[in-house]
Amino acid sequence: MGKRHQARELALKVLFQLESSEDDPEEVLRYHAAEGAATSDVAHFAGQLVRGVIANQEKLDGILSATSEHWKLEQMAKVDRIVLRIAVYEITIDRHVPTKAAINESIELAKTFSGEEAGRFVNGILGRVAASVT
């Protein structure tokens, strides 16, 4: 498993916990990084993702609302919503990763943490996001 994949997985765990708590993001990141024995590179990239998603959540949710036909954000499974936020951040704001790579990584995370059906769901929404960006 590559460093970026590990970092996305770490960011997902951190953002998942933060979704339903008022905990300090940096403390949660340090906790999960230590628990998973993440390297400094992995923790650094995960931190960038976490901070980017938090800082841009309103914009990310707006993009997701506009591209997730027939699905309100609050109806989505929590893990799917967070996977989508990370991907939309990478595709529309960060832009350091090729869109296809961000989508493929997100599909894999969704399948791992939410199931096969979630992978198809995430793929469909991110396909629309990517089409709206290019």
Predicted region positions:
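N-terminal interaction/assembly modules
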Residues: M1-G119, N123-T134
